[in-house]
Curated annotation (Swiss-Prot):
This is B9 domain-containing protein 2. It comes from Rattus norvegicus (Rat). GO terms for molecular function: gamma-tubulin binding. One of its GO terms (biological process) is cilium assembly. One of its GO terms (cellular component) is MKS complex. Residues 2-118 form the C2 B9-type domain. It is found in: Cytoplasm, Cytoskeleton, Cilium basal body; Cytoplasm, Cytoskeleton, Cilium axoneme; Nucleus. Keywords: Cell projection, Cilium, Cilium biogenesis/degradation, Cytoplasm, Cytoskeleton, Nucleus. The gene is B9d2. Disulfide bonds: none annotated. Signal peptide: none annotated. The keyword Nucleus applies. Component of the tectonic-like complex, a complex localized at the transition zone of primary cilia and acting as a barrier that prevents diffusion of transmembrane proteins between the cilia and plasma membranes. The keyword Nucleus applies.
Amino acid sequence: MAEVHVIGQIIGATGFSEGSLFCKWGIHTGAAWKLLSGVREGQTQVDTPQTGDMAYWSHPIDLHFATKGLQGWPRLHLQVWSQDSFGRCQLAGYGFCHVPSSPGTHQLDCPTWRPLGSWREQLARAFVGGGPQLLHADTIYSGADRYRLHTAAGGTVHLGIGLLLRHFDRYGVEC
């Protein structure tokens, strides 16, 4: 089977109004893909920017897939959360990006968004924290129901990804 190696890191995030940020991430693939090594999801540490608005995570990603075809190419889905001084966490943004399909190193910028909710939920978020969240995480990367959401823009997550493709020509898989 053809193989894909995804090696890189979640560098950090900019543009979020919240302070102490961390990122939950996961990778979604189609049925023809098999994870040979690595973990399918993870979480960064909390970083509070001291100067500027860049939260640095430098969280490693190292995945090795085998595939029979291109359908269901890997997508990286992200959830950025903020943590207050009491340890309470609230959603700062959702985002996703496709893993590039060409070999080499790539710098990706993944914009994020969060659901707004009703005016009461927005008011409660401003004073108490929390706020609306998605019931199903697959809504992040499937556009079927996403068009009905009222959202607010979040910040941007920065990723550095290196991609290695192996045996694509041997198994007749064309990129």
